[in-house]
Amino acid sequence: MSETNPAATAPVSADAAPHRYTAAMAAEIEARWQDFWDAEGTYAAPNPKGDLAGDPELVAKPKKFIMDMFPYPSGAGLHVGHPLGYIATDVFARFQRMTGHNVLHTLGFDAFGLPAEQYAVQTGTHPRVSTEANMKNMQSQLRRLGLGHDRRRSFATIDPEYYKWTQWIFLQIFNSWYDDEAKKARPIAELVAQFASGEREVPGHAGRAWSSLSEAERADVLGEYRLAYASDAPVNWCPGLGTVLANEEVTADGRSERGNFPVFKSKLRQWNMRITAYADRLLDDLDQLDWPEAIKLQQRNWIGRSEGARVDFPVDGERITVFTTRPDTLFGATYMVLAPEHPLVEKFTPAVWPEGTRDAWTGGHATPTEAVAAYRAQAASKSDVERQAEAKDKTGVFIGAYATNPVNGEQVPVFVADYVLMGYGTGAIMAVPAHDSRDFEFARAFELPVRCVVEPTDGRGTDTSTWDEAFASYDAKIVNSSGTDVSLDGLGVVEAKERVTEWLERAGAGAGTVNFRLRDWLFSRQRYWGEPFPIVYDEDGIAHPLPDSMLPLELPEVEDYSPRTFDPDDADTKPETPLSRNEDWVHVTLDLGDGRGPRKYRRETNTMPNWAGSCWYELRYLDPHNGERLVDPEIEQYWMGPREGLPHGGVDLYVGGAEHAVLHLLYARFWSKVLFDLGHVSSAEPFHKLFNQGMIQAYVYRDSRGIAVPAAEVEERDGAYYYQGEKVSRLLGKMGKSLKNAVTPDEICAEYGADTLRLYEMAMGPLDVSRPWDTRAVVGQFRLLQRLWRNVVDEDTGELSVADVAESDIDAGTLRALHKAVDGVRQDLEGMRFNTAIAKVTELNNHLTKAGGPVPRSVAERLVLLVAPLAPHVAEELWRKLGHESSVVHEDFPVADPAYVVDETVTCVVQIKGKVKARLEVAPSISEDDLEKAALADEKVVAALGGAGIRKVIVRAPKLVNIVPA
């Protein structure tokens, strides 16, 4: 049986107890409670005003706005990998409701996109028809999972009522410019006023008054300032797709990310967003966001602003050039690191290790050549994101060469390490471990010098041997930075940078430089199924915005939905859009309300990219039925405004895939900042906390032709896999219909129930880690629910089986198990560690099962409340059986008694050179001195040391002692 074979079903024997928790019972319970929630509006989150206003007491509570990256309504529907993030946010939202929050959690659809257009091309069916059918199917699938969404707030980006405001936002951006002095967007009318008054000189028209310029000349001038502008510029033209592509949609080898067609540079007139104007703010404000470091890193690298200095480090008559943003710390550079791909690695790697090379630097290899080759092979298997992400263990090897620090003449060792990339800067860094966290960790791992050159302001002193982390503040004075030709001691960071950069330039050892990578966002697509631009052109080709009264500009009917595609290798072709074929729609006579009366115009026939609708959808969730304005300011302030810990405001939690790091997430941040500058919103950032869930993977089986075969029909024999008698290969990868390995949530819900599916997906592992699907393992969570049910309900009678026992009469072991579970589950749910929360619930449930006899009612009630966020249907049913009329959704989450939570002892691991040699049971409050004495006196430790001296003992009471022998 394959891992994706759903044949392993919930066990039901013929003589099963009549009131046992079964798949049939789960189906009945789940359907009934889902109907109840809908009828009662259980998940309705009240606004402070407007048509969705509600209970003032609930509005007065702390609020949480929890969002998923909304789905595209695919015709294939959902497989079990899709709901992973949706279930996780639902668990978290339920927990937040139970801890006293007004929780907004809903879900819409990102419904413009290429698949529906391709289906329309193939079948002639309008994209809206197929898309709405797909949405209906997915809504049914999602409802069956018991997701607690406020359905009043749902919408699709294809709704004219929605994309009216997408078009409106485009016009706000079109009618704005970025004031570099004010560091914000301003209405274009204010720029026109400056030109008209003479306050600002008209660029390109020296000496001419604004009033003397023709309309076309004025339009050209303003086009150089507008935040949305059309220009004739080199674009990425893909003849095979018949459309132009943004930089982000082109692979490193110059092909389309979708379809793998050749992409050529071609000069075309296209719409662009001047996102580069916001590069500094987009970069700087990342520091205020609670996002994964890997995502921040991708955005930082994509934006690519780097201001600092180029520094040359001599090596054997050659030089290694680095780019550093902290030239003021040059005296603190104690080693260098090259990216594994750096072209100088081979050149500088000698045949033998230099005399005195430490064993820890060699990676266990006999020669530098072997060490570097092995390390490069290891690094080649990692993505850039994996290489740069924060990690506890830093890896690398010494290449066997030393470079000269130009400011003090010191010889510093040169390493190769995967946390340095070739695609950024020069592919080489000067490492200043005292003032960079990654360099600090690397230096500690390889026992490299850590020299303080920026005086700490936190009282830790300059003796780095006592430091636990780097000191990276800019608000400090430079120390230990005096050489023969230049001294920085006593200077502030900014002044020190200027002085050392001047010295580098005088000495011919470097120069001040700026690095910047971000480009303006190409915003035109030659597609049908997208938002039309609210722009028309007059007979002179000048662009004019439609007035608000003409929004939404809806998509017209066309006979052919596809753009014209060409020979993929024909670079001399030009786009032909579907909208351009509807002559009656393209050529119109309109009165734009500008005092000129009716005039002939030509509509823009490109459409907006599929990213447009997702750039602002968090705002529509707040006030989804408002037809008069983008969002009511009071409602936006309530849910998304700046507050303590969130200086830029934004959604409290946003969960979705890491693949959107430099597309959707960057674009949405840009739009938010423009809307903030123009006073339409109070939140300058859309999403304060971002969490990237992992992927549920599945095995893909392929025959000798490389074609995927149905996973459910593959048989395993003697460690090999066969399909219809033919041996097939197996590889872990994505799950999907085309790979013939998809398992649908409908199948699992039918076999076990939605609560079991929810528990299994949450229990598979940490939420941010990818994990393989195994249908055979689902039954484990089903059995947990059966045991839970059995601890509360008599399977023979269906009556409660709990005991009404006073808290004081419950045995201490049960109380300790209960309160430790309550404490642990609360912490785990808050930290989104759902797999360990389920493990703690299981541990408590098992304790109660083994204890025998009826479970005390107060213990059973708290157990049900612990389960409620994870398995809400069975929790509701048990809560009702326990005599409660209210829904468990808004009950208070249990609170642990600290007296029962403290462990009497904890396990301390004793390591020698990083290897575990002993485990000690010690008091949680043991001092570091006493712990060190106990570790050194342990028989196993004494034997392992074998009489060797001790160079250092690292103690982290009460759980770790690390001994470094002499």
UniProtKB/Swiss-Prot annotation:
Tell me which UniProt keywords the record has, alphabetically.
Aminoacyl-tRNA synthetase, ATP-binding, Cytoplasm, Ligase, Nucleotide-binding, Protein biosynthesis
The record, for Gene3D superfamilies, names: HUPs (3.40.50.620), Isoleucyl-tRNA Synthetase, Domain 1 (1.10.730.10), Valyl/Leucyl/Isoleucyl-tRNA synthetase, editing domain (3.90.740.10)
EC number(s) from the headed UniProt entry:
6.1.1.4
The record's disulfide annotation reads none
Q: Does the keyword tRNA processing apply?
A: no
Checking InterPro entries in the record gives:
aa-tRNA-synth_I_CS (IPR001412), Leu-tRNA-ligase (IPR002302), Leu_tRNA-synth_edit (IPR025709), M/V/L/I-tRNA-synth_anticd-bd (IPR013155), Methionyl/Leucyl_tRNA_Synth (IPR015413), Rossmann-like_a/b/a_fold (IPR014729), tRNAsynth_Ia_anticodon-bd (IPR009080), Val/Leu/Ile-tRNA-synth_edit (IPR009008)
Q: Which residues bind ATP per the record?
A: K737
Instruction: Spell out the reaction equation it catalyses.
Output: tRNA(Leu) + L-leucine + ATP = L-leucyl-tRNA(Leu) + AMP + diphosphate
Among PANTHER family, the record links this protein to: LEUCINE--TRNA LIGASE, MITOCHONDRIAL, LEUCYL-TRNA SYNTHETASE
Give the protein's recorded name. Answer: Leucine--tRNA ligase
